[in-house]
Amino acid sequence: MSIEIRKLSHIYNEGTTFASVALDAIDLTIQEYCMTAIIGETGSGKSTLVQHLNALLLPSKGEIQINDRIIKADEKPKQLKALRKKVGLVFQFPEYQLFEETILKDVSFGPKNFGASEEEAEQRAKEVLKVVGLDESYYEKSPFECSGGEKRRVAIAGILAMD
């Protein structure tokens, strides 16, 4: 899946005296199968940019093309559910994404939320936990009992399980 960002601008509180430009005419291409990191100073717009990649935020101006899908300011949130299945995000502190009582439940949450059966979600969770190096001894463990690195792997597995 390739991502093309064209002239993307985002203005918080647009049309008010509190308007603040977070992104101003950004152009960016992310090629298919390319892992990309967004880095920069505090307040530089990293989080705002990343939230546009799966339409958590919509552009004030410009557009984002993900494969054949073009996202503009006038999108309806219900039309974006399929897109959110395809674009997964892992934030700087992915362990903050963890919330279920066991690792297996946490990694299964995404697939279930997007319509997979309990069995399908659990099978997918087990597959991706293996990929990130967490064997069955982790399934019933609380994510909060894990080391920082293990928490990150659980969070990454949760994103991968949605594929």
Question: What do these predicted ranges mean?
Answer:
Residues I39-E41:
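The feature captures the beta-strand-to-loop junction immediately N-terminal to the Walker
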Residues I156:
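Hydrophobic anchor residue at the start of the ABC signature
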Residues S142-C146, E150:
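Conserved ABC ATPase signature
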